[in-house]
Amino acid sequence: MSEIKTDDPKRGIKLRGADKTARIPIKVVPLQEKLKKPEWIRAKLPSRKFFEIKDILREQKMHTVCEEASCPNIGECFSKGTATFMIMGDICTRRCPFCDVGHGRPNMLDPDEPKNLAESVKAMNLRYVVITSVDRDDLRDGGAQHFADCIKAIRETSPNTKIEILVPDFRGRLDIALKILAETPPDVMNHNLETHPSLYRKARPGANYQHSLDLLKRYKEMMPHIPTKSGIMVGLGETDEDVREIMRDMRAHNIEMITIGQYLQPSDGHLPVLRYVTPEQFKIFEKEAYELGFSNAAIGAMVRSSYHADEQAAEALRESHGGCGHH
C-alpha cells in the first residue's frame, strides 16, 4: 500500500486556472486576441441518460475525468452509458497548464474506492470502462497498486467489462509500477504523450517525452498481448511535421493505438489555442496513422483520449487475440 504523511495542513486544497499555473517554468501569457472557435468545434447536448449517470456518480462519490477536465464530449459519452473514472482523488501533484484538473497536495487514498468504483461500473452497466488518475508523485508506487486494486474489484463484479487504464508517467517509480500492472493487467494500456517534446517545458513541466515512450515500450515487452495506446493534442504550437514525428516515434516504440484531438483552452489561466486544425488535416493525419501501421486511429477535432474507446479497443483486442479485424 502506498504511504503518505497524514499531518499536512495544505492537503486537500485545490488550485485551478491561474493559481495552479503561477509556478511553472514558462509563464502562461494570454493571446492579445483569442482565435475564434471554428464551426466544426461542437459538442452534443446531453440526454436524460446523462443526468441518470450523474446521479449514480454522486451517489457513489466517484469522480469522472469527463467532469473534472470539462470534456466537451461529456453529454455524448454519458448518454451512451460510458464514462472515464478518475481515481485517487481530484487533486494532481503536477501543474500542466493545458489541463483543467486542480493542483495541490492530494488527500489520503480512499481504501473503499476500488469497491465503490466496481459498484458504479455495475450500476451503470458498462461494457467498457476507462480508469485514469491524477499524478500522485507523493506515493511510493505512483498509485500503481491502487490501479491494480481497482482492476481486481471490477473483474470480480463485472467480469465481462473490458478495462482500459490511462496512467500517469510514474516518474521515478516506473520499475515498481510496471511490475504491479503486469501482475494485474488491464485490457488496454494507455499513457498520453500529449504534445511534441519541444513543447514539454511549456505544456508538460515535470514530464519527459522519452520516459513516456519507454513506459509503453517496456510494458509491451512485458505483456505482448495487451494493446498499447497513446494520444496527443494539437493547437499548442506544434507543426504538422511535429505530429508526424510523434506518430513515427510511437510506432518505433510499438504503440498500436493513437488518439489525436484539438486542444481547447479551459480558461484564460491556461495555455492559449495557437491554431485550430481543420477537419481536412485531421483526415490526412488519420490516413498517415494507418499507413504507419497503427491498428486503430481516433483522430478528429473533438476526439479525446477515451472518446469512443470501446470501439477503438474492439479492433485492437481482436487483433491481439488472433482475430482478423479491418478498419
From Swiss-Prot:
Domain Radical SAM core: 78-295
PROSITE patterns for this protein: RADICAL_SAM
Positions that bind [4Fe-4S] cluster 2: 92, 96, 99
Keywords: 4Fe-4S, Cytoplasm, Iron, Iron-sulfur, Metal-binding, S-adenosyl-L-methionine, Transferase
UniProt main location, coarse: cytoplasm
Binding site for [4Fe-4S] cluster 1: 66, 71, 77, 306
Name of the protein in its database record: Lipoyl synthase
Annotated source species: Neisseria meningitidis serogroup A / serotype 4A (strain DSM 15465 / Z2491)
